[in-house]
Amino acid sequence: MSETSNKKLKITQYRSIIGCSKKQKATIKCLGLGRPNYSRVLNDNPLLQGQLRVVQHLVKVEEVSE
């Protein structure tokens, strides 16, 4: 079937959600962020890629080696 990826991504929020749509605010909350300069390390998957596409102007994404 499909190969599972062990790739991890560090997601850092660098812009505030003030003035953003409800969908973008909810996506930031689902990612576990909430304020500028908060970071999370999450496993890469298609769901995460879709969420990042919604808030690409608010976050920075870096690949992390384990």
UniProtKB/Swiss-Prot annotation:
Disulfide bonds: none annotated. GO terms for biological process: translation. InterPro entries: Ribo_uL30_ferredoxin-like_sf, Ribosomal_uL30_bac-type, Ribosomal_uL30_ferredoxin-like. Keywords: Ribonucleoprotein, Ribosomal protein. GO terms for molecular function: structural constituent of ribosome. GO terms for cellular component: cytosolic large ribosomal subunit. Pfam families: Ribosomal_L30 (PF00327). PANTHER family: LARGE RIBOSOMAL SUBUNIT PROTEIN UL30M, MITOCHONDRIAL RIBOSOMAL PROTEIN L30. Part of the 50S ribosomal subunit. NCBIfam families: rpmD_bact. Belongs to the universal ribosomal protein uL30 family. This is Large ribosomal subunit protein uL30. It comes from Chloroherpeton thalassium (strain ATCC 35110 / GB-78).
